Design a protein with these regions (language model features):
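Solvent-exposed, low-complexity, repeat-rich "mucin-like" stalks and linkers
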Residues: 22-60
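Bacterial N-terminal signal peptides
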Residues: 1-7
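Serine/threonine-rich, repeat-prone extracellular segments and beta-strand-based repeat modules
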Residues: 59-90, 94
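Catalytic His-Asp segment of secreted/periplasmic serine-dependent ester chemistry enzymes
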Residues: 251-324
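A short acidic, glycine-rich active-site loop
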Residues: 214-225, 296-301
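Active-site segments of SGNH/GDSL-like serine hydrolases
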Residues: 194-198, 230-264
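N-terminal secretory targeting modules
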Residues: 10-23, 93-126, 130-137, 147-148, ...
């Protein structure tokens, strides 16, 4: 009996392992937070969040406790809140509105001020993202000027486009299309064009300013930035004969400064007006708090920036332009 017992204990078969406890394989966002839209500076509210855990054995544990990781307060760069449980994470996407784009700064909430010298005037705006208001919910100084001063603004603006006619929907292409359209205005009180920040990425296409006697639109090389500017000015004079204003952004880089310098030569040749936000030191003296409120990035203003910072500059320039 003893011999049999010992032989039985010497079996070479492996001892069967007990099944391991299931572990968390991944987290599932079962229910989003009740509020996902915020203005920067607010605090995220996790009310409504439900997180489930899918286990390694295929089962699901519902409504697991989680730790929350999120910027407090929320910033313009906050993309999501992170829920963490047992080494796994799941994200709640957030949509953060810049403080300067809060509804209180919208054109809809801009008060009309009667008696403006710009009331009833028709202005044509040609530009790209800054003229469009790409970082301000599609609202720019043109929209605020129309609302406050009672002006009529035609805003021809497409983000990412250039003055130089080397890409689709360039300033030149769109302006020519408008001039050929059935709805082309017969009279414009002033023409305002953006010195595109997109052209600064193509310094090889800046070109040169033409001689004093070169005035016909067909004489200019529109594939060059400076040629396109002169072509546009010549066409405006030919079609409408109205004041022409070009506006320049606050300081950016050396390439943009080269463009500003070229525009100044062109302005002297053609007698056009520059809305100069590049060299205006007093205009650019902002506190960090103001800059954060007024600018979405180095190039694009927020609603508050257009309304409270840029608009008075354009009102002053346009009042001068339309003055009898």
């Amino acid at each position: 009996m003893v011999l049999l017992f010992l032989c039985s204990g010497c079996s070479t078969k492996e001892t069967a392992e007990l099944p391991a406890d299931p572990v968390v394989a991944k987290l599932i966002l079962a229910q989003e937070a009740a509020k996902v839209n915020y203005v920067e500076g607010e605090t995220f509210d996790p009310t409504g969040l439900i997180v489930n855990a899918k286990m390694s054995d295929g089962t699901v544990v519902e409504n697991v406790p989680f730790t929350l990781e999120v910027d407090t307060p929320l910033t313009r760069t906050t993309l999501f809140a992170v829920m963490r449980y047992e080494g796994k994470t799941v994200n709640q996407q957030l949509r953060i509105t810049l403080l300067g784009n809060d509804e209180q700064y919208s054109a809809a909430n801009m008060q009309y001020v009667p008696g403006s010298a710009l009331e009833g005037k028709l202005f044509y705006w040609l530009g790209s993202s800054v003229t469009y208001g790409a970082s301000a919910c599609g609202e720019s100084m043109a929209d605020f000027l129309a609302k406050r001063d009672g002006a009529v603004c035609i805003k021809e603006a497409v983000s990412g486009t250039t003055l130089a006619d080397v890409k689709k929907e360039s300033y030149v292409q769109r302006f020519n299309s408008y001039l050929l359209s059935e709805g082309c205005a017969k009279h414009v009180d002033a023409f305002i064009c953006q010195l595109s920040t997109n052209d600064r990425n193509m310094p090889e296409s800046f070109g040169t300013v033409s001689g004093e006697q070169v005035r016909e639109p067909e004489a200019f090389d529109c594939a060059m930035t400076f040629g396109a500017i002169e072509y546009i000015i010549a066409k405006v004079e030919e079609v409408w004969g109205c004041p022409v204003l070009f506006y320049v952004n606050p300081p950016l880089d050396e390439n943009y400064e080269t463009m500003v310098n070229g525009l100044e030569q062109i302005a002297q040749k053609w007698g056009i007006q520059i809305v100069d936000m590049y060299h205006d030191v007093a205009f650019n003296q902002l506190t960090e708090e103001q800059r954060s409120l007024y600018m979405a990035d180095a190039i694009h203003p927020t609603r508050a920036g257009y309304r409270d910072w840029w608009l008075p500059k354009f009102e002053e320039a346009l009042e001068l332009a339309v003055k009898p």
